[in-house]
Regions:
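Amphipathic alpha-helical segments at domain termini/boundaries
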Residues: 1-34, 191-283
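Glycine- and acidic-rich phosphate- and metal-coordinating loops
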Residues: 72-76, 110-119, 150-154
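Short beta-strand/loop segment at the start of cytosolic alpha/beta domains
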Residues: 3-72
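Small-residue-centered hinge/linker elements
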Residues: 58-60, 65-69, 79, 95-97, ...
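Conserved P-loop NTPase/AAA+ ATPase motor core
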Residues: 48-50, 80, 103-108
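A short, well-ordered alpha-helical element
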Residues: 57, 85-108
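Conserved catalytic cores of soluble enzyme domains
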Residues: 119-248
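STAS-typified acidic loop motif
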Residues: 66-91
């Protein structure tokens, strides 16, 4: 097959909505949504602030199978409030992960796939969102004992804030060139540090720090794949087949502490230096 034909046959992943992304990864005909839009479970706080809510609060929860393995698939809609998490959306995610734990305790090997496009906590529901993300993180740590918890950060919103910490707790992290992963978003850093220090409009600069390629080269992501539905699905299947890793990245904190102690904070570290610093992390 020629390169041109491959390009024509390619089906982008990041152009899909949250619900379409979930369906693209699951085995055909197995998609079953929990608390779908017709359940009308939406944020009670947005209306009070004259913000139009969404019937699913921007979070899609589905059960199904991938290669006949039971999975719960969690997909955040980045087009609604920047993918921010509030009380309802966060509770849906935490609840879905807890249900997966219950499945495993009953002998049903349910894994979790997180498709994340989020700026973190929803400012209009700050404290409630923070509490929800704490529950999500605890649920991930609990579930990953039994089955892989796989995070996919494909773009174009990226994954920031408290949910970026949740990603670091996952068994495996899959990213694309368009995906970004970082604790603080570019606009937040620019506001605090100034445009001379961190220009949020400089796309090459931003992606050189938080982009998928940089995160993978630094050992902070496990896979770097093309923006293609089939390739992302194949990578997820590969990690489901591998099962629970021998050591989760977050359990290897001593490695990162030792590396960070080598950094001279008097000088700005470059993306290339970050890659060199973490060389051998995946060995």
């Amino acid at each position: 097959m020629t390169d041109i034909q491959s390009l024509l046959n390619k089906q982008d992943f990041i152009e899909l909505s949250a619900r379409e992304r979930a369906k693209a990864l699951l085995d055909k005909g197995t998609f079953r949504e929990l608390l779908d839009p017709f359940a009308r479970v939406m944020s009670p706080w947005l209306i009070k602030q004259n913000i139009v809510p969404q019937a699913d609060d921007g979070v899609v929860i589905a059960k199904g199978t991938i290669q006949e393995q039971p999975v719960v698939l969690i997909s955040i809609e980045g087009l609604f409030q920047g993918g921010s998490l509030g009380e309802v959306g966060g509770a849906k995610i935490a609840g879905a992960l807890k249900l997966a734990v219950e499945d495993n305790l009953k002998g049903i090997p349910t894994a979790a796939i997180l498709l994340l496009e989020t700026g973190g906590v929803r400012l209009q529901e700050a404290n409630l969102g923070l509490a929800a993300i704490a529950e999500i993180q605890a649920a991930i740590v609990n579930l990953r004992q039994y089955q892989p918890v796989i995070a996919v950060v494909a773009g174009s919103v990226g994954c920031f804030g408290g949910m970026s910490i949740a990603v670091g707790l996952c068994s495996y992290i899959v990213m694309t060139q368009e995906g970004r992963l970082g604790l603080n978003g570019p606009q937040v850093i620019e506001q605090e540090a100034g445009v001379q220090e961190y220009n949020a409009k400089d796309r090459p600069f931003i992606w050189s720090i938080t982009g998928g390629n940089q995160r993978f080269a630094s050992g902070l992501a496990d896979a770097y794949v093309d923006d293609d539905r089939q390739k992302i699905r194949e990578q997820v299947i590969d990690y489901l087949t591998q099962g629970v890793p021998q050591q989760h990245r977050s359990s290897n904190y001593s490695f990162y502490l030792a590396k960070l102690q080598q950094v001279d904070t008097a000088e700005q570290i470059t993306p290339a230096q970050v890659q060199a610093l973490y060389q051998g992390e995946q060995a």
